Regions:
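Structured surface interface patches that mediate subunit assembly and partner/cofactor docking
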Residues: 1-5, 9-16, 20-33, 37, ...
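Extended, alpha-helix-rich binding/interface surfaces that flank or overlap catalytic cores
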Residues: 40
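Glycine-rich loop at the start of a catalytic domain that most often binds anionic cofactors/ligands
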Residues: 44
């Protein structure tokens, strides 16, 4: 499994949540307490633009269209950039250097976790297969290091041992599932 396999599941799942949003939903609070649904969606768009640049390609931030259209367009463009770049070798992500294959995993991780945030805020659910959620949890454990806790991510939330892979992933990212 890799970022493209995961995104083949997480992008449609995220889009399904975004397609059901109303204009009023955009101002709803999310589990990311300082961000609204609209803020989280725009964060995903900006993340996809950044991740495309990490793969060496510039994509524009959309200025028109629905949140669903903008997330989908930038995610698809970022995935295409990574397909062209490939998953071998190191890449610079901000001040860090990491394996390209790991950096590309941020795309499906962002789509699933922030899709979950938006789903929770709007009374929806988001689906992910146990395989994809488990795989992304393993990648999240590589990406979310202790030094990122408290700034970008809250502390891991405890969950029962029998919790689903998606619940474990969400809890690991500091959100109460």
């Amino acid at each position: 499994m890799g970022p493209f396999d995961c995104a083949a599941e997480t992008l449609p799942a995220c889009r399904a949540v975004l397609q059901r949003l109303t204009e009023d939903d955009l101002s709803r609070p999310t589990p990311c307490t300082e961000y609204t649904v609209g803020d989280v969606g725009q964060h995903v768009v900006r993340s996809m633009v950044l991740l495309a640049s990490v793969a060496g390609e510039r994509i524009d931030t959309p200025v028109a269209g629905t949140l669903e259209e903008n997330v989908a367009a930038t995610a698809e463009a970022a995935l295409a950039a990574w397909r062209r770049h490939g998953l071998d070798g190191p890449v610079a992500v901000g001040r860090s250097v990491m394996p390209a294959g790991l950096a590309a995993q941020i795309i499906p991780l962002e789509l699933l976790v922030h899709g979950w945030d938006i789903a929770q805020a709007t009374g929806q659910s988001i689906d992910a297969s146990p395989e994809v959620a488990s795989y992304l949890l393993a990648r999240a454990r590589e990406l979310i290091t202790q030094d990122k806790r408290g700034r970008s991510f809250a502390a891991e939330v405890p969950v029962r041992p029998e919790a689903t892979a998606l619940r474990r992933l969400i809890a690991f990212t500091g959100r109460p599932p």
